[in-house]
Amino acid sequence: MCIRDRFAIIQSAIVTSIAVIGKGWGPGATEAGVFIGNRSMELFVDIAMTTIAAGMVGLALSALARSQEQIMPLLVVAIMSQLVFSGGMIPVTDRIVLDQLAWLTPARWGFATSASTIDLTRLVPSPLSPNDSHWHHTSGAWWFDMAMLVVICVGYTGFVRWKIRLAAAN
């Protein structure tokens, strides 16, 4: 585990603590997480894994940019696409292009793990929220979402290693 991942985990712990202690769970919240049992700890794991995967996207963008001037436009596009493809603001489920592109973003799977942990489909039933199978409060949905975050981390890590090897060869 690198220093970047440690900072991501610490930041996730701070954000989760502020949200849980400051805001509380509120009425109607699920009593337990899907897999871990402790909903606060599971929410922390969701956010920490999402933060680590998002950090890998940042590393991939850094490897892609050839100069410092190129990185800012890439970051703007990456951040805006994360907002769109998470599925929280704009439903991506069953939308032909959005649904497929969302599979490449950590925000999609991070939001899905958190939605699965807090049972978002029960808290905000359709038609206000999409009937996304990845948001269901089941261990299968939660594990699939987590596995997708791991796949994204591995994929972007492989891309970064490939770009670094190309740069070293030149």
Residue ranges of model-derived segments:
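Membrane-spanning alpha-helical segments of multipass transporters and channels
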Residues: R4-N170
